[in-house]
Amino acid sequence: MAAAAVSGALGRAGWRLLQLRCLPVARCRQALVPRAFHASAVGLRSSDEQKQQPPNSFSQQHSETQGAEKPDPESSHSPPRYTDQGGEEEEDYESEEQLQHRILTAALEFVPAHGWTAEAIAEGAQSLGLSSAAASMFGKDGSELILHFVTQCNTRLTRVLEEEQKLVQLGQAEKRKTDQFLRDAVETRLRMLIPYIEHWPRALSILMLPHNIPSSLSLLTSMVDDMWHYAGDQSTDFNWYTRRAMLAAIYNTTELVMMQDSSPDFEDTWRFLENRVNDAMNMGHTAKQVKSTGEALVQGLMGAAVTLKNLTGLNQRR
């Protein structure tokens, strides 16, 4: 998600797009893989770039979790199958969209070695037993692979948030304060970038391209909307928009800090995040203050976009 995309979106025309995209709607979610938000946040703090499964329960707060989920073998390595009336199993029809999804999911394994490139996609296709020529189904700039990854990360985060909500409703977990909830939500989402952090500046520069801004903005607004929804936000006035704009700015500025952070386990990044969330909460007690806070953060984000431009293509982490 590009910082410039957010700052542009919060301008005159972009702000209207954000308003249209972020309308409160009822949510109907699918059944989720059991996992706990707080346990995931704590577990992710203790993990490095090793891929491991998230903890299953709230009590497993110190279990290590994966930075990026491994593709589901059923969905990644074979097309859908069905059993005919004779009892013989045959391959079901696989749409082009389903095939592309499988290829992109498999390609993520090769991003650390090849970056967000056609080479990574070709390797992913070959790992599925397909020809490397399948990479020609996608553009050469890697934008489809990046957007696929961002979509997967947002889906994982939603599952984590929903699972915690269920635990709270069942009385198996204590509802946390809004600032703590938002801080952990942003950290959990950002930790999903760790296995790909060396190539993430390049990914952000690609997401800044004009043809990628609508999709990138849509994914960002959807993510921060989910965070506020599960945090218990029920505002229906102008605060509904400013809170989401404010959180989007916090996410993107923290993302930029993370790309340059060389501290152990990104400790400086999480400290920066905690300070920004605390500042936003302390300054946001009235509608007027919330609006001022959001405007100030957006101005800062516009400056951060310049920083990102300078970082593009360069590895700033030591």
From Swiss-Prot:
UniProt keyword list: Acetylation, Lipid-binding, Mitochondrion, Primary mitochondrial disease, Transit peptide, Ubiquinone biosynthesis, Ubl conjugation
Residue segments, region Disordered: 44-98
Transit peptide endpoints, chain numbering: 1-44
InterPro entries per the UniProt record, alphabetical: COQ9_C (IPR013718), COQ9_HTH (IPR048674), Ubiq_biosynth_COQ9 (IPR012762)
Known outcome of mutating residue 227 to E: Impairs interaction with COQ7
UniProt motif SIFI-degron: location: 16-31
GO cellular component terms given for this protein: mitochondrial inner membrane; mitochondrion; ubiquinone biosynthesis complex
Keyword Transmembrane helix: no
Chief place where the protein resides: mitochondrion
Residues involved in a 1,2-diacylglycero-3-phosphoethanolamine binding: 244
Posttranslational modification: In response to mitochondrial stress, the precursor protein is ubiquitinated by the SIFI complex in the cytoplasm before mitochondrial import, leading to its degradation. Within the SIFI complex, UBR4 initiates ubiquitin chain that are further elongated or branched by KCMF1.
Effect noted on mutating residue 298 to S: Decreases membrane association by more than 60%
GO MF annotation list: enzyme activator activity; isoprenoid binding; lipid binding; protein homodimerization activity
One Pfam match: COQ9
Any GO BP: mitochondrial electron transport, NADH to ubiquinone
Disease affiliated with this protein: Coenzyme Q10 deficiency, primary, 5: A form of coenzyme Q10 deficiency, an autosomal recessive disorder with variable manifestations consistent with 5 major phenotypes. The phenotypes include an encephalomyopathic form with seizures and ataxia; a multisystem infantile form with encephalopathy, cardiomyopathy and renal failure; a predominantly cerebellar form with ataxia and cerebellar atrophy; Leigh syndrome with growth retardation; and an isolated myopathic form.
Family indicated by similarity: Belongs to the COQ9 family.
Function as written in the Swiss-Prot or TrEMBL entry: Membrane-associated protein that warps the membrane surface to access and bind aromatic isoprenes with high specificity, including ubiquinone (CoQ) isoprene intermediates and presents them directly to COQ7, therefore facilitating the COQ7-mediated hydroxylase step. Participates in the biosynthesis of coenzyme Q, also named ubiquinone, an essential lipid-soluble electron transporter for aerobic cellular respiration.
Protein name: Ubiquinone biosynthesis protein COQ9, mitochondrial
High-level lineage: Eukaryota, Metazoa, Chordata, Craniata, Vertebrata
Gene assigned in the entry: COQ9
